[in-house]
Amino acid sequence: MLDKLLRLGEGRMVKRLKKVADYVNTLSDDVEKLSDAELRAKTDEFRKRIDGGEDLDDLLPEAFAVAREAAWRVLSQRHFDVQVMGGAALHFGNVAEMKTGEGKTLTCVLPAYLNALSGKGVHVVTVNDYLAKRDAEWMGRVHRFLGLDVGVILSGLTPDERRAAYHADITYGTNNEFGFDYLRDNMAHRLEDRVQRGHNFAVVDEVDSILIDEARTPLIISGPADAASNWYSEFARLAPLMEKDVHYEVDLRKRTVGVHEVGVEFVEDQLGIENLYEAANSPLVSYLNNALKAKELFQRDKDYIVRNGEVLIVDEFTGRVLLGRRYNEGMHQAIEAKEHVEIKAENQTLATITLQNYFRLYDKLAGMTGTAQTEAAELHEIYKLGVVPIPTNRDMIRQDQTDLIYKTEEAKFIAVVDDVYERYEKGQPVLIGTTSVERSEYLSKQFTKRKIPHNVLNAKYHEQEANIIAEAGRLGAITVATNMAGRGTDIVLGGNVDFLADKRLREQGLDPIETPEEYEAAWESTLNQIKAEAEEEADDVRAVGGLYVLGTERHESRRIDNQLRGRSGRQGDPGESRFYLSLGDELMRRFNGATLEALLTRLNLPDDVPIEAKMVTRAIKSAQTQVEQQNFEVRKNVLKYDEVMNQQRKVIYEERRRILEGEDLAEQAHKMLVDVVTAYVNGATAEGYAEDWDLEQLWTALKQLYPVGIDYHDLVDSDAVGEAGELTREELLDMLIKDAERAYAERERELEELAGEGAMRQLERNVLLNVIDRKWREHLYEMDYLKEGIGLRAMAQRDPLVEYQREGYDMFVGMLEALKEESVGFLFNVTVEAAPPAPSNRVAPVAAPPGLSEFAAAAAKAQEQTGQGAVATKERETPAPTLRAKGIDNDDTPPLTYVGPGEDGTAEVQRSNGGPRHAAPGGATRRERREAARKQAKTSKPTRRRG
């Protein structure tokens, strides 16, 4: 029903877009008459009009006409009307559903150019580094021709290179790179260390893959937490002793394990504990679950391999060994324990955000894909994105044959090889889609036996994938590919002309970035030569039926099946597709496999005779719909839990931004001082009369905070108050606040004598930034711990999400109170010394970042220069003093670990060498780590100054 409601306005939107395209066409004649210089000058003209108040929507027809003409002159490619319609849909903040081969990459040029004119930046998001680099070079030629800067964000770039790329008018990159840069910016200790400049407009290529498939895995930056626990090994010993369906049950569909009461008793007996689920033992539940998952759900040589004593993850879809990546939440350690290899330490979360919440930061979001209709409801519900199906430039004449279902996998693959051999004999190109590297290698062996030449895409490098895919439409080409491999490159009958022309020019030593003038000069003649060769071959391919797409298994998502089919029949070309299935396929086993097997048994058909039945097709569609719904629920659940963190993250990141931008924090520091003293007094005077108050204990606590100038004995005995019973809470609080303000003013004078005027403001920034970061990390750790055990609340008939929201809020409020107390203590008690100012224009070394106080000093200097929140100081030409606060700075730089979604949506892990300065406290279990963290917090609390 929701799908139908969402599609009600589609027709009206398409008509509106058609009118836009028609209007752009009326401007084409005038634009074509312009010289190259005049066309380029249009960019400056548009910018002036925007500065004058003209709206981007009003500029759209002219800007699109200019960009279309530039693409024709630079790439010899002119946008079709449907591409102009797609570009307009993107500008209006929609998902443009454009079939494979309709030119989504070229379509993106139009809205990217228009929105870049505002000067606020445009981000074009792709699924991998190769596509980001390719599109930045390829489409960047058009933008550079029109006078715009184009940047690309790739893994491995330095911060300076990233900053330059973000300050370009249009920036290409992957979702993970954009997201991690956002998180790193909010861990930076100097304003100039940030690289992004805002979130204006993003166009997401393959939007279904990025916003849906990959949205189950949040982006996480983490650092080392502790040494590995011996509990992993202990539970790895217990797991083989436990029996499936006796001690525990396994749900393959949801990839979960559930421990029965018998299993709990078994573990309790083995460990010699009375109650596994009591608070002191609750961390052990996580070790048990991970050990059982490692045993039942993670298979060696399928999900991972063991090489040189190390557990390496294998990408199920592409078959790549994911070097340097690890499962999170203790899962990787559980597998290491199972395989008896070295167990490496867990990581502690330092910063995290979901892709859903990252992309909702943008003022305007748009996306392109060939297959979005099946997820229109989710895109609307989570991102408020409408899906607009763009008509094809030419009618699609591909023939989609019905599925063939075999009883066994062996019979299925024999039939596949026979079918491919027949097609190869007549020269028809074939693309065979598999769901895993294991099956693609098996098929490759069968083809080799039959002497069928072929290419296999178990690619380790996207560039090699693209090379093979670009030639997969040539006469007699047989290509075996996993479903996710080679996306972003068209399979063009006769070969991809642009790709082949670029390849030939690069072979001649020409490059669009390194040698742009020579590259452009040779482009047109090379392109024409390739075109003639390819068109002749394309006619031969059309004569034998076009590209034949053969799927060897249904994917759990209909969208992936449609993507595979969509490889064939582009731009009105002939084509054909068919899926070969068996009862041994993963999807069939998970849903209704037994029913179908019983049916085939009753029919008494031989193994090599397939069936074609609507009932089977319906069963498959039902199974896929169920999986899609389950995955949607997982993504919604991830978002609901992250929404709690998102509100808290906004508060912390906004506070950090204010500090980095040099805002005067004197008023905030004063408020914190008053709040902390008030909290101390409230705690001491909460119950009873004045004579019952333990003023000695209150004074002891206050002396740990600041140098108290009042003796409570004098206070009680003074004539002003009289007897102790006459002392009111308000009088006590008023006296102590005035005393604390006196002490703070004295502290400020001391620092100014030591390091000059403005020194206290500098220390406030230094301390606040340090304490916020440390408390936020501790809070993330506590929230991780809370979320890990919150599911158990369901056993008490409580909604885990509601409990998480309530307790998470309470913990956040508690963290803010602790932040105030610790900040005030440091401001009074930290030992400060003046350091000589750094020479101007000095370049900081890359390997070792300066201490926190130097960071704050730099921020203070920047603040003085900009005049924002300036402190009243005497004019002077000498450099601002630099403070060094002992006990705050810590120059340790443990390696950072980045966890984000891979192209198939599963978590992937990467490491770097630099990181934040504070590692988490050590300990064997999470509970032990918490205790260690608390002890460390206590010992690191500031003590009273002496002297």
Swiss-Prot record:
Tagged with keyword Nuclease: no
Chemical reaction(s) catalysed: ATP + H2O + cellular proteinSide 1 = ADP + phosphate + cellular proteinSide 2
InterPro entries linked to this entry: Helicase_ATP-bd, Helicase_C-like, P-loop_NTPase, SecA, SecA_CS, SecA_DEAD, SecA_motor_DEAD, SecA_preprotein_X-link_dom
Subunit structure: Monomer and homodimer. Part of the essential Sec protein translocation apparatus which comprises SecA, SecYEG and auxiliary proteins SecDF. Other proteins may also be involved.
Main location per the UniProt record: membrane
Molecular function GO terms recorded: ATP binding; protein-exporting ATPase activity
Bias-annotated ranges (Basic residues): 935-947
Top-rank taxon: Bacteria
Cellular-component GO terms for this entry: cell envelope Sec protein transport complex; cytosol; plasma membrane
Compositionally biased spans, kind Basic and acidic residues: 925-934
Alphabetized UniProt keyword annotations: ATP-binding, Cell membrane, Cytoplasm, Membrane, Nucleotide-binding, Protein transport, Translocase, Translocation, Transport
Amino acids binding ATP: Q83, G101, E102, G103, K104, T105, D490
Membrane topology per record: Peripheral membrane protein
Function: Part of the Sec protein translocase complex. Interacts with the SecYEG preprotein conducting channel. Has a central role in coupling the hydrolysis of ATP to the transfer of proteins into and across the cell membrane, serving as an ATP-driven molecular motor driving the stepwise translocation of polypeptide chains across the membrane.
EC number, UniProt record: 7.4.2.8
Protein name: Protein translocase subunit SecA 1
Region (Disordered): 860-947
Family, per entry: Belongs to the SecA family.
Intracellular or extracellular location(s): Cell membrane; Cytoplasm
Cited Pfam families: P-loop_SecA, SecA_DEAD, SecA_PP_bind, SecA_SW
